[in-house]
Amino acid sequence: MLRYSRVLLFLIIAALSSCNQYNRILEDVYDNDQAAREWTKWMSSLSADEIVEYSTEMERVDSLNQATVFGILDKEGWPSHLSDKANRAIWIVIDHSDLAYRSKYLYLVKEKAEEGVLDKTDYAILNDRVRMEEGKPQIYGTQIKMAATIVDDDIAMQLCLWPVENPAALDSLRSTVGLSPIEEYLKTSSESIGQEIVWDKEKTVADFD
């Protein structure tokens, strides 16, 4: 019995050591991701050359972060017992990757949202974004995009809610993932960016081409 207890203790210590190692690695990933995006806060004051320089560096950091995070996910799956910051790092790296990777790891984000490791809104946003980039209607109404709209008999580009698969059930679906009613969301988002966001229920995906 003592032998088995020692084996169990060894396994627990090894697991904790592995968890701590992942936390250190992933928390560094999070910090690097955020640092690489600091420049976007003052982007309006930068020259074109400076924007190119910062963008290139951000892409380099993203590439390194993706190699780290996706290497862990592909080899070990999503590690358990991570810190909130480490879990957030995985989500951010997936979110900042291209469509192929977002689609690949979407099921993991859904699993972790259902487990409470991530917010359900994280899954809703990623799911809608993937569907939009695949040319499909979104589910939760989190994505907006520019589209040609008739304004005062003229055609103008307008920020619009990307088409929704089931408009009648939208608010109900949003509530299941902790999102506010769509009209409230559109109002606050419009005020935040200083530009009206329109939901034209007649628009289809084809209208955004």
What residue ranges belong to the model's regions?
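Immediate post-signal-peptide N-terminus of mature secreted/exported proteins
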Residues: 19-60, 67-70, 205-206
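Mature extracellular/secreted ectodomains of secretory-pathway proteins
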Residues: 70-145
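Anionic, Ser/Thr-rich low-complexity intrinsically disordered regions
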Residues: 133, 138, 159, 202-204, ...
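Second-shell loop/turn segments in exported
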Residues: 51-59, 91-97, 156-160
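C-terminal partner/receptor-binding element of secreted or periplasmic proteins
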Residues: 173-209
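Short, 15-30-residue, compositionally biased linear elements
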Residues: 153-168
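Bacterial Sec-dependent N-terminal signal peptides
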Residues: 1-25
